Amino acid sequence: MATGKIVQVIGAVVDVDFPQDAVPRVYDALEVQNGNEKLVLEVQQQLGGGIVRTIAMGSSDGLRRGLDVKDLEHPIEVPVGKATLGRIMNVLGEPVDMKGEIGEEERWAIHRAAPSYEELSNSQELLETGIKVIDLMCPFAKGGKVGLFGGAGVGKTVNMMELIRNIAIEHSGYSVFAGVGERTREGNDFYHEMTDSNVIDKVSLVYGQMNEPPGNRLRVALTGLTMAEKFRDEGRDVLLFVDNIYRYTLAGTEVSALLGRMPSAVGYQPTLAEEMGVLQERITSTKTGSITSVQAVYVPADDLTDPSPATTFAHLDATVVLSRQIASLGIYPAVDPLDSTSRQLDPLVVGQEHYDTARGVQSILQRYQELKDIIAILGMDELSEEDKLVVARARKIQRFLSQPFFVAEVFTGSPGKYVSLKDTIRGFKGIMEGEYDHLPEQAFYMVGSIDEAVEKAKKL
């Protein structure tokens, strides 16, 4: 095991000098004793002359030149398998929940090759989420990739928590949650929510929060993904939740300049597309098992053309776009039905009835969008009878797209609802065909199925 010495420390980037005949490989883990704590470094570049440039996986405070560094001669390895379920771990797979050792039987390196072309499988099976707007407008594929796009505070994390709860309870599958650079409070809320719903023993939690150094946030997504790959290779259908993929990109940006790379557009790292590709290509389904991934994507300044969200778009099967305008109307989940897309919304996959209903809902909402200017200037009375009907139905549809969440019961005071796809299609079809024209639009707000809206109307 070779030993080197620290020659330079700039923030999270540490240069280490090794003997010429024992230079560590790129992505090897190194270990240094920093006071009472062991700090892990990951080799990023070989600079020549025996010097390697590394990223620290923890705080580099207290490091000084001349400290001894050991080459562990393998990449960072984390525990995998059932022992990780119900536990909270950090980027190195060490437990941070005060419950003792993980007790794993196996450890895997976090850097792995993506499955080869012939191992991949293509599935057309739908994954029912119980959330009306998602199941109708942008259905998820089992083994597909979904992005939750939204600016600050429109509900990405709440939507993700609801998805985990619904899928864990209704489909009883294993999930891995990677918290990448998000708020520690959310991580804490999330753990307690999972415990209260009795699904914690089906979820592995890996956290690298906002206060962690960039090296930690850059690698924590890979730690979570490695745990998910193990479940997949055992022949299971596993869910991988990443909150937030933007912080993964941002961590790369933070260390990129320190590693001596020229910045590219908007100051992002020049290797943005490659870094994203390396992660996304591993999140895939094979003939043994599937990984269905849901990734929250923070959209800086609500600009979807920013390089980070734009690079993520290319890898997804379905996009759920959360809109600030819809959130400001008090409609939650604030999913934009006109902006959200899914490859699965195809009559050959979802069936003709589902497809026609979704497209019908979109055309009514689109027409309402066009009429809004006329209504704002001239008022409702100037519209034709046909347009008045479209507006009335559109407003009912808009309200019916809202739904009380289980994970938000504390805030809303109304019990959460899980709506089956069959009931969702029946409800929206009924509104479009005019079956519920006689009901007031308030009856459709924050209810589950259409039958609940009818019941609510009787009380109004």
Swiss-Prot record:
For the protein in the UniProt heading, the enzyme class is translocase
Catalytic function, reaction form: ATP + H2O + 4 H(+)(in) = ADP + phosphate + 5 H(+)(out)
Gene Ontology MF terms in the entry: ATP binding; ATP hydrolysis activity; proton-transporting ATP synthase activity, rotational mechanism
Q: Establish whether keyword Transport is in the entry.
A: yes
Q: What keywords were assigned to this record?
A: ATP synthesis, ATP-binding, Cell inner membrane, Cell membrane, CF(1), Hydrogen ion transport, Ion transport, Membrane, Nucleotide-binding, Translocase, Transport
- In what way does this protein cross or attach to the membrane? Peripheral membrane protein
- Predominant location category: membrane
Look up the EC number in the record and give it: 7.1.2.2
Q: Which InterPro entries match?
A: AAA+_ATPase, ATP-synt_VA_C, ATP_synth_F1_bsu, ATPase_a/bsu_AS, ATPase_alpha/beta_chains, ATPase_F1/V1/A1_a/bsu_N, ATPase_F1/V1/A1_a/bsu_N_sf, ATPase_F1/V1/A1_a/bsu_nucl-bd
GO CC annotations, alphabetized? plasma membrane; proton-transporting ATP synthase complex
Localization (cell): Cell inner membrane
Q: Which residues bind ATP?
A: G150, G151, A152, G153, V154, G155, K156, T157
Q: Give the protein's function.
A: Produces ATP from ADP in the presence of a proton gradient across the membrane. The catalytic sites are hosted primarily by the beta subunits.
Listed under subunit, the entry gives:
F-type ATPases have 2 components, CF(1) - the catalytic core - and CF(0) - the membrane proton channel. CF(1) has five subunits: alpha(3), beta(3), gamma(1), delta(1), epsilon(1). CF(0) has three main subunits: a(1), b(2) and c(9-12). The alpha and beta chains form an alternating ring which encloses part of the gamma chain. CF(1) is attached to CF(0) by a central stalk formed by the gamma and epsilon chains, while a peripheral stalk is formed by the delta and b chains.
* Protein family membership: Belongs to the ATPase alpha/beta chains family.
Read off the HAMAP family from this record: ATP_synth_beta_bact
Record NCBIfam families:
atpD (TIGR01039)
Spell out the protein name for this chain: ATP synthase subunit beta
